[in-house]
């Protein structure tokens, strides 16, 4: 059973069961009930995002037809209604339009959804979303001459097509983020069309946009996967921690209010409710900016930006400084009160306030580390109040909570030490060996992609100051592991990976760190084909040569996951000797055929395969 179902997180679920319950039980009104929308809404672009994300293979013409029909079916609000507040949620109308398009749904394999009830139908369409559909090619930067002409002739249609292309390639990317990057792309085009070297301008500036889009898409998909697999409670626990770290001067009641509404917005965004995702996000940002004097002095410049720009700016803004007079630790936070005598509601509030107070004191820690500390603290209290001396038990136990931080620090020190010693490429090779042993069922390209990100994380985070290193490393590892878990959900890897992915969000990374070798894996029969070497090894350079060497490394470990470090070093030394000998000779292909076979025989004998 997931630890997030413990009392520690029940209070968070209570916040989101309904806005009425939240307001009645805690006396806190939701921001989303009171704030008005301030920005003009382009329903055509929003509807385009919706239909392109839900039927990714549909052509632009097909999506445009669905958009037109859906918007025609929606009653236009009067001027008074429009100015008085926000548009109503149009999700049901969009889903109805999807189901009216029987030919399109049949064509792309979505027709099974419309026979279900409203909620089931929605979930069915969500399940059809694919992060990287094979039928859709990577986005290519448009040819400048044609693009500039099309943009000048009909800017609105040109930008709507761009939104369509982005949405279908990134089905989990939040609508406001798509609109934000579309707006930035809209600014790039006129300047690049006038540039002396338009091709270079487009390639350079558009490459930045597409890179940021990919990264934003990964983050949004990760957030949605956490909410789906671990529930709203876990997501809200994450949000409590992040907001308390960012807004260190804010009291617990205000954090509660923000947690409710931030999680509510993410839920809309993850379910493809494009209108509520946009409007409710705007409300929260408007509220935060209206309260910036009390929330944080780090967001002043953010609040001067457009509504779309504010969100990204605030999210990436620095944490506020710790308030003066804040005690360095939370020793005896409970005091002499008997935790086991608390009512369920009292326990909820107390533990929530502990998370808030701990987070604002430790902005340098990763969210997952703080959640591990919080779980440990709950278990400590439950244990101590069954002893004769609860206070003494607490004092000893609170020192033990440091083990969660120390484990994270030790991992960071070890990883950065290896990075300094080996460099990024050889560190990736070390990760390759470790993760091929943990998950030999992954393809070579998957293993290389995962470990490349891990090595890049070390290269980035190990350059940071100590107060930023831990959060950087653990945070990046959480995203990388999260996407491995999304892959496992689609195509199961092995029981060990499955256990780590599903048992506990907070403990996912330590769980993966503790995996060594997948004992359920049965290596395939030895095949010489995977170890045949050719003269192209001598011709390859840079990344191409590194990739070939890594393929050899992966195949070797997959053949014998229990291979020792000494055995591995010996085989690699022999392989390097083979390259040196054959690449210096005239008859390279003959050399590889003869000497390569000797290497294979020697390796098989040494490994017993």
From Swiss-Prot:
* Residues the record marks as carrying a glycan: 42, 251
Q: Which residues carry this modification: Phosphoserine?
A: 111, 115, 117, 344, 444
Which UniProt keywords are given for this protein, alphabetically ordered?
Copper, Disulfide bond, Glycoprotein, Metal-binding, Nickel, Phosphoprotein, Repeat, Secreted, Signal, Sulfation
Hey, what tissues is this thing expressed in?
Plasma. Synthesized by the fetal liver and yolk sac.
Gene Ontology terms, MF aspect: metal ion binding
Q: Which GO terms describe its cellular component?
A: cytoplasm; extracellular space
Q: Which residues pair up as cystines?
A: 99-114, 113-124, 148-193, 192-201, 224-270, 269-277, 289-303, 302-313, 384-393, 416-462, 461-472, 485-501, 500-511, 538-583, 582-591
Compartment list: Secreted
N-terminal signal peptide = 1-18
Protein task: Binds copper, nickel, and fatty acids as well as, and bilirubin less well than, serum albumin.
According to the record's subunit comment, the protein's assembly and interactions are: Dimeric and trimeric forms have been found in addition to the monomeric form.
Query: What is the name of this protein?
Result: Alpha-fetoprotein
Query: Which gene produces this protein?
Result: AFP
